[in-house]
């Protein structure tokens, strides 16, 4: 593709620079050129002292595209749609839900939302404030808005794509016009997303005038993060080396927690505290063999996966999820096999969810035996997806390494030991110096304060302590003078104090100002981190009044909700507020990025 250059007098480039630019981009597609525009815009605005232009009010033809992402999938879909729209010469403003000024929603004419769901039907962390606002009485009428929603979820959870459903339903209730029916996509979302993106482009091309995308539409919020500019992605991971696999719980602990160190070599892979490490794993060969034998299948039977033909056993080991059952798998297996044991569950969503949650796929087959063809088995299963682990290190200290904290999942089903797919792969089946495929999942919604003087409160029981190890390494390297406070909990002090020596050193050296520990099984009555929060409520409120940033990491379904309830009680009690005002205060902290959560 070539473009006619303007007269040299009008250019800020020398003739030699212009020639190099034209040579470098002569074969770029319109989509690639649009992406490059956003890339350069991002570079300009990350230069020291660079001023970001104040964006003028969006004209009626600008499409607002909101990305509400938890693990990065929704963001990738939104970025791909942005590129499609720019290639179609449509103006689009891509913005993360956490950066969106939601009170301007009444002025939107064209609104596209790509939303994932976390936990039990909750919106992603960056979209909590927007979700709460839209579902509240404060939400305005949207009679002049047209919208479309793409939802991402996981059918292994009961409230599949609930956040997307909430946005779609509420926007319609507020009077907005639905451009397209909502799409709810499972973990294998790519094909559905591609088809939906094309439909969105077609509808919008017919609706708005075509014009060259203006610079204002490619805003800093939609620009490329330079840290993220890497050839290694979820689809094209880095082959790294596992260098350390160390059990960090005691001999008598009920938990098996591993400290894992991975050598990134000279790949140049960069991350920040708060990011996650994606790990591609293989299923246990013994589990694969057990499943094959139960179904009377041969491991060497050739099957087709995508464009590849490979043995069935290899396909099961590398390409399909075997350790997480879902209601859909149970229902489809029951229908396919006409199993007398499972057919009574069909049509009862609650019973299907309960059965799937407590019965792994291999045990479902054992309890309801059948004989399947290889293609029938693969048709039941979901594609294998990588697991994400909160990074427990800072490159300011460990350089070309990345550390994670892995709680190994182990349980018994009628005397048979079962284990989590990725956690047992890392703990049991990878020897030191073995290769492991990894990538960085950046998380801009879990970041240290920009100013090193800001106090930090960290709440992370169990393996939720991982990112706070990274935070402290970074704060130490930066010489940050802000106070640091850690709340940590686990069953037993003697067996389960993860990274104990490191925390004690930070306390001794004064970097860790306070540490409050909750050992749930070391006394007759159970004590959890939320109890410590209530106990230290007055001091916690003082820190918040001083501008402290508050972070929570760990279990989404119970711990994070219990911690949030304790925080609300503290805010109400020591801030002199009623429950509604305390909730509003915490929401404001979230909007200001002073209350951030990494929950799963």
Curated annotation (Swiss-Prot):
GO CC, alphabetical:
cytosol
GO BP: any one term: hydrogen sulfide biosynthetic process
Q: Where does FMN bind?
A: 69-74, 116-119, 152-161
The major lineage groups are: Bacteria, Pseudomonadati, Pseudomonadota, Gammaproteobacteria, Enterobacterales
Q: Which Gene3D superfamilies would you find in this protein's record?
A: 3.40.50.360, NADPH-cytochrome p450 Reductase, Chain A, domain 3, Nucleotide-binding domain of ferredoxin-NADP reductase (FNR) module, Translation factors
The family line of this record is: Belongs to the NADPH-dependent sulphite reductase flavoprotein subunit CysJ family. In the N-terminal section; belongs to the flavodoxin family.
Q: Where does FAD bind?
A: 323, 357, 387-390, 405-407, 420-423, 600
What does the entry's cofactor note say about binding and number? Binds 1 FAD per subunit.
| Residues of the FAD-binding FR-type domain | 235-449
Annotated NADP(+) binding sites: 520-521, 526-530, 562
- Molecular function GO labels: flavin adenine dinucleotide binding; FMN binding; sulfite reductase (NADPH) activity
Disulfide linkages recorded for this protein, renumbered to the chain, are: none
Q: Which PROSITE patterns match?
A: FAD_FR (PS51384), FLAVODOXIN_LIKE (PS50902)
Recorded catalytic reaction(s): these are: hydrogen sulfide + 3 NADP(+) + 3 H2O = sulfite + 3 NADPH + 4 H(+)
Pfam families from the UniProt entry: FAD_binding_1, Flavodoxin_1, NAD_binding_1
Q: Which domain of life is it from?
A: Bacteria
Does the entry feature the keyword Electron transport, yes or no?
yes
List the InterPro entries hit by this protein, alphabetically: CysJ, CysJ-like_FAD-binding, CysJ_Proteobact, FAD-bd_FR_type, Flavdoxin-like, Flavodoxin/NO_synth, Flavoprot_Pyr_Nucl_cyt_Rdtase, Flavoprotein-like_sf
Q: What is this protein called?
A: Sulfite reductase [NADPH] flavoprotein alpha-component
Arranged from A to Z, the UniProt key words for this protein are: Amino-acid biosynthesis, Cysteine biosynthesis, Electron transport, FAD, Flavoprotein, FMN, NADP, Oxidoreductase, Transport
The top EC class, named as a word, is oxidoreductase
Which cofactors are required for activity?
A: FAD; FMN
Matching entries from CDD domains are given as: SiR
Task performed by this protein = Component of the sulfite reductase complex that catalyzes the 6-electron reduction of sulfite to sulfide. This is one of several activities required for the biosynthesis of L-cysteine from sulfate. The flavoprotein component catalyzes the electron flow from NADPH -> FAD -> FMN to the hemoprotein component.
According to its UniProt record, the EC number is: 1.8.1.2
């Amino acid at each position: 593709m070539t473009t006619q250059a303007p007269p040299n007098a009008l250019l800020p480039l020398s003739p030699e620079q212009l020639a190099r630019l034209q040579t470098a981009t002569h074969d770029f597609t319109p989509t690639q050129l649009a992406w490059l525009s956003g890339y350069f815009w991002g570079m300009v605005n990350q230069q020291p002292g660079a001023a970001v232009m104040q964006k003028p009010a969006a004209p009626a033809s600008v499409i607002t595209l909101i990305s509400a992402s938890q693990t990065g999938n929704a963001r990738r879909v939104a970025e791909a749609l942005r590129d499609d729209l720019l290639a179609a010469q449509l103006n689009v403003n891509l913005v993360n839900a956490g950066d969106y000024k939601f009170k301007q929603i009444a002025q939107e004419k064209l609104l596209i939302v790509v939303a994932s769901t976390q936990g039990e039907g909750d919106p992603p962390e960056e979209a909590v404030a927007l979700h709460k606002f839209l579902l509240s009485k404060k939400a305005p009428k949207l009679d002049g808005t047209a919208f479309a929603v793409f939802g991402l979820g996981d059918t292994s959870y009961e409230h599949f794509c609930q956040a997307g459903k909430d946005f779609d339903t509420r926007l319609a209730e507020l009077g907005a016009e639905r451009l397209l029916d909502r799409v709810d996509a499972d973990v294998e979302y790519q094909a559905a997303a591609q088809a939906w993106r094309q439909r969105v482009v077609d509808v919008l091309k017919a609706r708005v005038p075509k014009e060259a995308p203006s610079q204002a539409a490619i805003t800093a919020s939609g620009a490329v993060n330079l840290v993220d500019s890497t050839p290694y992605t979820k689809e094209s991971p880095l082959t790294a080396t596992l260098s350390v696999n160390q059990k960090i719980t005691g001999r008598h602990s009920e938990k098996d927690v591993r400290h894992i160190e991975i050598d990134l070599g000279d790949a140049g892979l960069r991350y920040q505290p708060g990011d996650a490490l994606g790990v591609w794993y293989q299923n246990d060969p013994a589990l694969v063999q057990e499943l094959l034998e139960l179904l009377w299948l041969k491991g060497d039977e050739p099957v087709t996966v995508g464009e590849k033909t490979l043995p069935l056993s290899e396909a099961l080991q590398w390409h399909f999820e075997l350790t997480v059952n879902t209601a859909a798998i149970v229902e489809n297996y029951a229908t396919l096999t006409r199993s007398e044991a499972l057919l009574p569950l069909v049509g009862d969503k609650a019973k299907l969810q309960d059965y799937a949650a407590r019965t792994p796929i291999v045990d479902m087959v054992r309890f309801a035996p059948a004989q399947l063809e290889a293609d029938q088995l693969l048709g039941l299963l979901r594609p294998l997806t990588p697991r994400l682990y909160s990074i427990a290190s800072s490159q300011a200290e460990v350089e070309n390494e990345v550390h994670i904290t892995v709680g190994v999942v182990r349980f018994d089903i009628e005397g048979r030991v079962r284990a989590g797919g990725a956690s047992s792969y890392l703990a049991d089946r990878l020897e030191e110096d073995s290769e492991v495929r990894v990538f960085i999942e950046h998380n801009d919604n879990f970041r240290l304060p920009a100013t090193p003087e800001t106090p930090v409160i960290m709440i992370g029981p169990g393996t939720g302590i991982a990112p706070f190890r990274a935070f402290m390494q970074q704060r130490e390297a930066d010489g940050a003078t802000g106070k640091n406070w850690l709340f940590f909990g686990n069953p037993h002090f003697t067996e389960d104090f993860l990274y104990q020596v490191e925390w004690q050193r930070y306390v001794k050296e004064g970097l860790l100002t306070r540490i409050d520990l909750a050992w749930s099984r070391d006394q007759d009555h159970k004590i959890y981190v939320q109890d410590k929060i209530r106990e230290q409520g007055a001091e916690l409120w003082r820190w918040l009044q001083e501008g402290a940033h508050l972070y929570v990491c760990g279990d989404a379904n119970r711990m994070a909700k219990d911690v949030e309830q304790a925080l609300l009680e503290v805010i109400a009690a020591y801030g002199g507020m009623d429950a509604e005002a305390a909730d509003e205060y915490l929401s404001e902290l979230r909007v200001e990025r002073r209350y951030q959560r990494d929950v799963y």
